[in-house]
Amino acid sequence: MSNYNAVTAKNTENAPNGNGLYSQTVAFSHYNNLSAQLPIEPQTGKLVAGGIKEQAEQCFKNIKAIVDSIDHVMSDIVRITVFVKDIKDVDAVDEVYKTFFPTYVPSRTTVAVAALPMDALVQIEALVSHGEGTIPNAPQAGDLIKLTNNTANAPTSPLSTQTVSFSHYNNLSAQLPIDPKTGRLVTGGVQEQAGQCLKNIKAILESIDVPFDDIVKINIFLKDLSDTEAVNEVYSTFFPDSAIARAVAYVPARTVVAAAALPMDALVQIEAVVSHGDGTPPQAIEDRHGIVIWANNTENAPKNSLSTQTVAFSHYNHLSAQLPLDPKTGEMVAGGVKEQAEQCLKNIKAIVESIDHVMDDVVKVNIFVKNIEDMDAVDEAYKTFFPGGVPARRTVGVSALPQDALIQIDAIVSNAEGTPPKA
């Protein structure tokens, strides 16, 4: 087994610790998954003094400390996700952002949410390339390059790259419903806006010669969760895209999140994670024939016609967000937030086990909670599933969740065996 990648968690004293609940960064294969960073001073464990600017700076300092501690640099970051409490604070965050990314800019998602841990104003997360891989005692050359791409056929921004490819994944900036010709929001309501977001994603993928059905995970941020049905109507006209994908009814994994606000006062914003069989140099393009998408659903977790429970490509599995639904009844589990958190994690465990994996293979967990004060109760349940506190983690408070749930959880899982074509 020694020639397989291993889940590698790391922590440094120069950034806030996860109190045994999560690691600062978990590397697997060619990516480091960082826990979302709060504006906490590592020395004191308290929020930094000052306003939004000081808080944003502290988040980036913490990210930099983690990145430095694993012998990487800030330009190895392929995606940044910025969560703010107040969308008007984004300009101040951007001022700080520029000082940490003076030339190269990663792909980026910006969203305002209802609440953040410790009453912070901002929380920032980074995904970092890891060319050396994680095969124990056998580091790779680390010579993979990342490819950045922008097309005039989708909205451009000086603060983000439309897509950053590294190894077998493309990471797209979240797309707003902006008409690239005018630079303004498209006219119409949420359906027109959702259509424009998806058109922009399609334009970016076409510009790098990647089919739309190579998307493995979609994250939809909605200003009003009650718009979900309207967005689904548009969504189902885009997926599946090709005849071959329709033949197997392939749809990506998916998470829907209620945003307190979105940039430009948009009603919807859509983020895509995309498989990249061509790889990045010096990986050989023709090797793509040896890597395919594995999509999987199990009866032991709730099913949804618009999303696959887990989609694997190469060394990662991407899980759809799990609600606290009992898969047998399709109903919300009885009890409070602790029971709900437990059910979400049971569903994740059922999905993970259905693809012959174990919870130790989980590298990153994203928690969306209705009431941020509930996190102590959530953590009680969480610890029983992740006693070692290994996976990296992100927690955000949201104003609403599907089916009036109190919590929703999704996960990224390592996939050491890869995804060769099945005989």
List PLM regions with ranges.
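N-terminal presequence-like segments and the immediate start of the first folded domain
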Residues: 1-61, 65-78, 84-199, 203-216, ...
